[in-house]
Amino acid sequence: MWVFGYGSLIWKVDFPYQDKLVGYITNYSRRFWQGSTDHRGVPGKPGRVVTLVEDPAGCVWGVAYRLPVGKEEEVKAYLDFREKGGYRTTTVIFYPKDPTTKPFSVLLYIGTCDNPDYLGPAPLEDIAEQIFNAAGPSGRNTEYLFELANSIRNLVPEEADEHLFALEKLVKERLEGKQNLNCI
C-alpha cells in the first residue's frame, strides 16, 4: 500500500515506510483551505493547512510512501488518527518524477468541504494573516507553511505552486514588517 503526502506528510514523516518516491497526482490543486484546531491552531483560532480541491487542470507534487509489508493496517490506523479533523480517503494515480517508473495507485487523504474544520477559499491576504497569527500543539502555523514551501522547492525546483509560494511571500512580508516595528 502506498500513501501520497502533499502537506506535512512530506516533511514530518513520523511513521515507518519501506520506500518513498517524489511525483505528482493530477486533477487536484493544493490549497490552504482546511482549518486546523488540533495541530497548527486551537478551537476558536484555527490555523490553516493544505487540502486538495478538484481541478481538471491541476497537478500536485508530493511524496508517495510505501507502507511496510505486514504493518500497512497499523500505519494506516496511525495516519487515520493523524489526519483526523475531516479528512476522507480516496485512491488516485501517482506519477513518479522518475519517468522510468510506471504510474501506480496511492491512498490520498483529502479534507472535504463538508467537514467541520473546512474553512474554504478566502482572499490570499486573509489566509496569510490567519497563518501568521495561528499556533497550536504542533507549533506555529508559519512553520507549517515555510516547511512545505521549502520541501516543494527542494524536491521539485521547477514547480511553481502559485498558491503556496504567494502565501509564503505574504507571510514573510508580515514577519519582516513585525521585525522592522520591533527595531523602532
Swiss-Prot record:
EC number(s) stated in the UniProt entry for this protein: 4.3.2.7
InterPro entries associated with the record: ChaC (IPR006840), GGCT-like (IPR013024), GGCT-like_sf (IPR036568)
Tree of life domain: Eukaryota
Species for this entry: Homo sapiens (Human)
Lineage, top ranks: Eukaryota, Metazoa, Chordata, Craniata, Vertebrata
Signal peptide limits: none
CDD domains xref list: GGCT_like
Its biological purpose: Catalyzes the cleavage of glutathione into 5-oxo-L-proline and a Cys-Gly dipeptide. Acts specifically on glutathione, but not on other gamma-glutamyl peptides.
Keywords: Cytoplasm, Lyase
UniProt-recorded Gene Ontology molecular function terms: gamma-glutamylcyclotransferase activity; glutathione specific gamma-glutamylcyclotransferase activity
Family label: Belongs to the gamma-glutamylcyclotransferase family. ChaC subfamily.
Gene: CHAC2
Cystine pairs: none
Subcellular localization(s) per the UniProt record: Cytoplasm, Cytosol
Recorded catalytic activity of this chain's protein: glutathione = L-cysteinylglycine + 5-oxo-L-proline
Residues that hold substrate according to the record: V3, F4, G5, Y6, G7, S8
Any single biological process term in GO: glutathione catabolic process
Protein name per UniProt: Glutathione-specific gamma-glutamylcyclotransferase 2
